């Protein structure tokens, strides 16, 4: 009895194991197993059945001479590529749009320091400031006028002492007695110094006598190739003839041999 029971139990266990193996094999070899029912497509040699479209996958299974095909409809690649290209185009356009916006911002922003300042606030000028500016301008004009008058007087209206000096020097240069003693040419100058301005300044004295006659007295130095001397002269302006005439003209030879020469002397008529 015990032997029979053991044989039954072993047979039952073997049967259960075989059933489980068959079930697993059938499930593994079953067409379209593991694929959602809503996405299966089954094709046979006699008819075509369409359940629905679904996710990815394609599976073939041959159970008998009559083959059945289980497929799974996949979305068209056009849609996925379209979405990919559209996304790429959007991402590629975004940097360009950002650059264009940045350029627009750069062009529209203005530097406040470059903008023209047409309205500069001006400080009102008071009466005192205006008067002081006017005085400064008038003083400058006065100085410029005085300088211009001095230059004009020196160039156009020669002073009286220089007229007497030029006339006396011309008379001495033409005199033979002086040329024999100091040589020729003879030059005249105001003072014995190397200062050019001092040499050009002629010592003089201007006065009017009791008759109302104007007199000019000058003295200057002369020098020639062989010697030098000093000149004393005085001239007056004749009212009748309106000319300058000598009162006297004396030349004192200093070198090489001292001598005094009276070249001109006025003798009233």
Swiss-Prot record:
GO CC terms, sorted: cytosol; mitochondrion; TIM23 mitochondrial import inner membrane translocase complex
Topological type in the membrane: Single-pass membrane protein
Cytoplasm keyword on record: no
Region described as Disordered: 88-115
Biological process according to GO: protein import into mitochondrial matrix; seedling development
Tissue expression pattern: Expressed in leaves, sheath, flowers and buds. Lower expression in roots and stems.
Biased composition (Polar residues): 88-100
InterPro entries for this protein: Tim21 (IPR013261), Tim21_IMS_sf (IPR038552)
Disruption phenotype: Strong lethality at the post-seedling stage.
Keywords, sorted A to Z: Membrane, Mitochondrion, Mitochondrion inner membrane, Transit peptide, Transmembrane, Transmembrane helix
Transmembrane is among the record's keywords: yes
Feature: transit peptide: 1-70
Transmembrane segments: 130-152
S-S pairs: none
Subunit structure: Part of the respiratory complex III. Interacts with TIM23-2 and the cytochrome c1 and c2 subunits of complex III.
Protein function: May participate in the translocation of transit peptide-containing proteins across the mitochondrial inner membrane.
Family in the record: Belongs to the TIM21 family.
Protein name: Probable mitochondrial import inner membrane translocase subunit TIM21
Species: Arabidopsis thaliana
